[in-house]
Design a protein with these regions (language model features):
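Juxtamembrane "helix exit" motif at the C-terminal ends of alpha-helical transmembrane segments
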Residues: 1, 74-88, 140-145, 226-246, ...
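Short, small-residue-biased leader/transition segments that mark boundaries at the very start
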Residues: 4-5
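Hydrophobic alpha-helical transmembrane segments of multi-pass integral membrane proteins
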Residues: 18-41, 63-81, 102-111, 129-139, ...
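Membrane-interface amphipathic helices and adjacent TM-edge segments
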Residues: 30-72, 200-204, 283-310
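Juxtamembrane helix-loop transition segments at the membrane interface in multi-pass membrane proteins
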Residues: 39-52, 116, 120-128, 181-199, ...
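Membrane-water interface regions at transmembrane-helix termini and the short interhelical loops
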Residues: 45-53, 83-87, 108-124, 142, ...
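Alpha-helical transmembrane segments and their immediate juxtamembrane interface regions
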Residues: 87-89, 93-124, 250-276, 338-364
């Protein structure tokens, strides 16, 4: 399962490979955020806390997220400590080693979580996304160095494979920018009532547009899918269950048969694209606000009909955006395997999506 842990380095900046104090990185916080967002969508109490309690409610949910991140970080820390135990020096108590290592790892993870929250509070950008962005950037020198070294060997197939991969990455970057910036502009018209000395009347209608993004979730579906796909490995290592270990090995991106991993990753990205779109875009609220403001979509009745129309448009847009994200996450990896060029493993399509997406969001 070594290749699975290598993929987790996008959350840790190489921490897992180097086994540093910050080996867990932002991963426990990402997992905790996923759990809380799923619970918020399914539990009325949490949903009410987020929507109706204002800033106090959001702070309460943030506090719950921290506690969940701490708990999940402890579980992952113990798992890693138990894996590392076999490499420890002789004469060290197993219990002492596991406890000390787990405490160091979970403390490092909590420090990273705190830094991400400071970044968010200072208005620099979305903290967790920027931490992952910086982690990926931190691996670039090593990746580029390995690529240059491979090209200098003079092997024709290797050089050709690198050129093909670079072209695929360039096309991918263009596609990411297009999808991240793409939106469906729905025409809307408004007619304001005029009250004055001349009596009551209606001003001429004004037409503008309501933009619905092609990829409403941004890079979050990729980040969430990347985190969730590692959960079976963590659970398998924690329980030592033979069946779970065999099942988790199917999700190894470096396995002889990569299709189970590819299909699972694709399905997770598509699922989280819909999930995150439902969190960021609420057709019912939009329709209600349009109706209150005297704004309508031509040919669509205000109210529930508008909500149904917007929901249908958003679902189609999310399908297109999710299919694109899933394809972009898989195709470059397939090309990498076909060309047998392994130097870009530290900068896969997933990392590229996060780099470009976070850069665009932060620039705004």
């Amino acid at each position: 399962l070594g290749d699975v842990y290598k993929r987790q380095d996008i959350f840790t900046g190489g921490g897992i490979s180097t086994l540093g104090v910050f080996a867990l990185g932002i991963l426990p916080f990402i997992n905790a955020s996923i759990i809380l967002q799923l619970l918020t969508a399914s539990l009325p109490q949490l949903e009410d806390l987020q929507k109706n309690e204002g800033e106090a409610g959001r702070r309460k949910i943030a506090q719950i997220t921290r506690y969940v991140a701490l708990g999940w970080g402890l579980i992952q820390s113990v798992v890693f400590a138990m894996i590392l135990r076999q490499y420890a020096l002789e004469g060290i108590s197993e219990v002492v080693f596991v406890v000390q290592t787990a405490l160091c790892l979970v403390t490092g993870s909590m420090v990273v979580m705190w830094l991400s929250e400071v970044i968010t509070e200072r208005g620099i950008g979305q903290g967790a996304s920027l931490v992952i962005f910086l982690n990926i950037v931190g691996t670039l020198p090593r990746t580029l160095g390995a690529t240059i070294e491979a090209a200098q060997t003079g092997d024709r197939n290797t050089v050709l494979g690198i050129i093909v991969l670079v072209l695929v990455f360039l096309v991918t970057i263009v596609g990411i920018i297009f999808v991240q910036e793409g939106a469906r502009r729905i025409p809307i018209v408004s007619a304001k009532r005029q009250v004055g000395g001349a009596g009551v009347g209606v001003l001429p209608t004004r037409q503008s547009y309501l933009p619905l993004k092609l990829n409403a979730g941004g890079v979050m579906p990729i980040i969430f899918a990347s985190a969730v796909i590692f959960l079976p490995v963590t659970i398998a290592n924690f329980t030592k269950n033979e069946w779970l270990i065999r099942a988790a090995s199917l999700l190894n991106p470096g396995a002889a048969n990569p299709w189970p991993y590819a299909l699972a990753f694709f399905a997770l990205i598509l699922g989280f694209a819909y999930f995150y779109a439902s969190l960021t875009v609420n057709p019912t609220d939009i329709a209600s606000n349009l109706k209150k403001g005297g704004v309508a979509i031509p040919g669509v009745r205000p109210g529930s009909a508008t909500a149904t129309y917007l929901s249908g448009v958003q679902n189609r847009l999310t399908l297109l955006g999710g299919l694109f994200l899933g394809s972009v996450a898989i195709i470059p990896a397939a090309v990498e395997r076909a060309t047998n060029v392994q130097t870009f493993q530290g900068l896969g399509a997933t990392s590229l999506l996060i780099l470009v997406g976070v850069a665009i969001d932060t620039a705004k």
